């Protein structure tokens, strides 16, 4: 699905070749809405997708998640040692993706004194573009660990008590598997604001918190630090997001493809 594969799938449909699309988000894009009228299957990851597609074509598969996250084996102490953190203070993981998330980074930068005063540790993944500036800002705060990119996300997820992230479909699917309390700051720079809709779907199930991008610099860390003082609410969020995990999504999608090949 999506605009990149749209012409190929459209040509296949015109030629009578069976097609499948996977809609990863909670709000279907324009191309998938068009393609969805003639596909054999639509593999989805959110409830309510009959708003966009023929209900008979919809199969709830979830979104594939990389095996390293599905099968995390590292222990807590090993993860803490990797980042040079301790078990006595809570840990916030801030994830901006490989390119970084400007507003999220600005929110951390504006809150370093507040974070230090709260006695909280932070793993701050900035993206390459913001790394040097963030490293300079955090150099006076030894409990804030700055990385441009984290290859060992299994360690980061294991160490974290709360995770701050954008709300892309793949990221949300990973975080459902991880099952930690999450605060989402959806990117406003995406088609049809689909990240906000992704996050709202979790908020509606009490499975995450949502801070609009426009409010993040003022409120993100107030909300996050306040949440750290509410262990029962943290547990509720963790339990509810974990309940949304679909660890065998890739297998389900493959099964749908195989079934169509055999019909």
Residue spans for each PLM region:
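An aromatic- and histidine-rich active-site surface loop
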Residues: 1-15
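Short alpha-helical segment that forms part of, or immediately flanks, the ligand-binding pocket
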Residues: 10, 154, 172-180, 200
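Active-site-proximal region of nucleotide-activated glycan assembly enzymes
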Residues: 13-76, 85
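Conserved donor-binding/catalytic loop of nucleotide-activated donor transferases
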Residues: 15, 158-160, 174-185, 205
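Donor-nucleotide binding loops and adjacent catalytic segments primarily
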Residues: 74-163, 195-199, 204, 211-220
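A short, well-ordered alpha-helix in the C-terminal region of glycosyltransferases
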Residues: 81, 233-247
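Short hydrophobic beta-strand element within catalytic cores of glycosyltransferases
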Residues: 165, 181-192
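C-terminal alpha-helical cap of glycosyltransferases
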Residues: 246-263
